[in-house]
């Protein structure tokens, strides 16, 4: 089980901003306490952050929906480094490693 966060690298965000956005994504993705969440918690809470541009993120969201994999999109309020309404990242999962890897294995670590 793993949770993958696709972080936008095609917009300018500082490291602190990226960390905050990743936390928002992780909290949002794990807010529904279903059996996948419980399994993820019991198996080490693996989290991986990968680089992506907006086109790739939107493509991966569509692929997840087709495969029944939960996603959580972070839309920024625009108070600091990006414009209001900017999609900064998306969380995928938590779900089985194999299912998530099928969608995200072509992306590189942040």
Feature roles, as predicted:
Residues 2-33:
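Glycine- and Gly-Pro-enriched alpha-helical subdomains that act as flexible
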Residues 4-6, 43-55, 66-110:
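Short basic, glycine-rich beta-strand/loop surfaces that mediate nucleic-acid
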Residues 26, 41-43:
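Low-complexity, intrinsically disordered basic tails/loops
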Residues 35-40:
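Flexible, glycine/charged-enriched surface loops at secondary-structure junctions
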Residues 57-62:
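Short amphipathic alpha-helices within nucleic acid-binding modules
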